[in-house]
Regions:
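Cytosolic catalytic domains that perform sulfur/thiol-centered chemistry
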Residues: 1-270
């Protein structure tokens, strides 16, 4: 999941640059063009890691065929060491990592360091966009990591035994403020763990205190389904739960924005 590059054989790695800005959708690509880890492929949140033609929330999940094509043109194989990075302390590398995890890439990790820190550590950088040899990789999808809308509906009805955990801020969770989606509130029955709590001084951390905070919301032996507004900021919460050795975790990629897209979908406030 989250790993310092100091612990990795970076010379044998394949790199994915997932930098992005929700406020400026072109920023990640501009930063990549200015400088990136040598050999890194750029994956864009909107163009590669979402299917914006769909109506299933604000960052809908791409079809498996599209993800397979992304992996193949990126030259990836299932047994590759793949290091994904972004600005550091952001949700975009975890989002990219989750798709790799879902597809069966067992050695994909999220760099704890953002690009500036990677460069400061002396990793080679350049402005060249690589053209990797196309692979014929065949993903091995693990559906136990994915929560469909139907699964979440069954969870709300009490039929799955999974615990919903909302990764948004407490004020959005309670429905007091909603700056993005048209309906304020949360999916009924959800608990709350603000993804910003996963960070310390702008960097993800996984110490004993954080594990205690997570366990105070949901126990490791419970099955957990995480969501946020659009499936982006829930990805680091998913990754951190796995880091904390929670064995049964799912991600509702459509998240709250998908949930409220259905007329008369129930929501809770307070």
């Amino acid at each position: 999941m989250f790993v310092s590059v100091d612990e990795l054989n970076t010379q044998q790695a394949k790199w994915i640059d997932a930098r992005f800005s929700l406020q400026d959708s072109g920023e990640g690509r501009r930063l990549y063009n200015e400088s990136h880890v040598s050999g890194a492929i750029y994956w864009d949140l909107l163009k590669d890691l979402s299917d914006m033609s769909k109506k299933d929330g604000r960052h809908p999940m791409p079809e498996k065929d599209a993800l397979t094509e992304l992996f193949r043109r990126s030259g990836l194989e299932l047994d590759d060491l793949i290091i994904v990075y972004d600005q550091g302390g952001s949700p975009f590398a975890p989002r990219a990592w989750w798709f790799l995890h879902y597809a069966g890439f067992q050695h994909a990790v999220i760099a704890l360091e953002g690009f500036d820190e990677l460069q400061a550590k002396g990793l080679p950088v350049d402005t060249l966009e690589p053209s990797p040899a196309r692979s014929a990789v065949q993903p091995v999808w693990n559906e136990e990591l994915y929560a469909s809308r139907e699964f979440v509906e069954q969870t709300v009805a009490g039929d799955t035994g999974s615990r919903l955990v909302d990764a948004r801020s407490a004020v959005r969770f309670r429905g007091e403020v909603e700056p993005i989606d048209p309906i304020a509130g949360r999916i009924p029955g959800a608990l709350n763990f603000d993804w910003e709590q996963l960070k310390e001084d702008g960097r993800f951390h996984a110490d004993a205190t954080l594990r205690e905070q997570l366990a105070s919301v949901v126990k490791p032996e419970e099955e957990v389904t995480v969501y946020c507004g659009s499936g982006v900021t829930a990805a680091p919460l998913y990754a951190m739960l796995k880091q904390a050795e929670y064995p049964n975790v799912r991600l509702y990629v459509g998240s709250y924005s998908d949930w409220i897209s259905k007329e008369d979908a129930p929501v809770e406030k307070g």
